[in-house]
Amino acid sequence: DGLPEPVLFYQLPYISEDGINTPAMLKRLYELRDYARHNIDTVVSVGIGGSYLGSKVIFDVQCGAFWNNLSTEERNGYPRMYFAGFNVDGDYLAGLIRTLEYQAQTKGSDYKVMLVITSKSGSTIEPMANFMILEKALQDRNINYEVVAVTDMSDDEHPTVLRSMAIENHWKTYSIPYGVGGRFSVFTEVGFVTAALVGFDIEGFLAGAASMDAACQEEDIFKNPALLSALLKYIASERYGRIIEVFMPYGEALHSLSDWYVQLLSESLGKMSNTCLPYGRTPVAAVGTMDMHAQVQEHQEGRLNKVVQFIKVKDWKHNLVVPNTHSKYERLQALGNVGICDILNIALDANREALSSDNRFNMTITVPTLNSFHLGEIMFMHCWAVYFE
């Protein structure tokens, strides 16, 4: 991102008066949460890279795919949330503007939008272009809106463009901390603003990260999951030529976790240096079971140049049972009365066993269930793993 900064992500799981994440920060986030529940109908989160990917993971885990179709009561008062700024796509943005316009027409003059614009420099092309188009569209349609800016607040003498805009227009502001790259920023206000606006358990998320941080300080490699992962992947790359990593959680709620990991791995290992040879792996985002019908044949029968990283959730919230409604068809009989999430995990196990039986490198991380605590564990483990590697 320009000049080198210290790497301070290891401080992020802890709330302290003199830390990066403070009690005062949490208080402001909870005030934002309570305000939005009573005053905001729709949030549009505008950002790219680390200013988008971690927030999207939080949204997907907390809200799921159909959040914006629920009633206000079903959302417990929390606003709808859409994302923009992660690309410069006029068709996508026009569709979003039309959606906001329709919602405003349906509710009337009480309808209100919150634009959350996140940019460290305040001049990143994609989010700022999207933001300016969205703001003008809301103004032209007389739709009530307010702006929250998340940007670098560290330099009072040379404020970012976005911070200057926020001061001039009296917008609420939150901070992108010094020493925390975008790939780690989900554990800061960058991710927490989104978290607060949809009712995600921020303190549970940090507790999971802190639990994993403690494990990652263990000197015994077999008690340190991040160090073990880093060592195995390094050996796989340098000794066995496994220079591609397929990151493959099973379940739609974790689809965006793959995209987040692609950035984390790429920006952490893809470094130019005058003191060492180039190193890294090419990350490939995948999701099960969908990509079992797209990528997996190549994983199982293609070149021996990949490691596959699975993420498994043991118990899902809604293990819907397949009804035994077409049992006269022999090939469908086995599905009757089986939980659909059981099918998901059986598919993962079968994929893993097929790879292992052919000496194709893979590893599986299993969590008991998917919640804020275990998500914090998963994400912080991978932060430490790329650091160790």
Q: Which residues does each PLM region occupy?
A:
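Extended, charge-enriched "interface" segments that sit outside catalytic cores
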Residues: 1-37, 325-330, 334
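Helicase-primase coupling helices
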Residues: 284-370
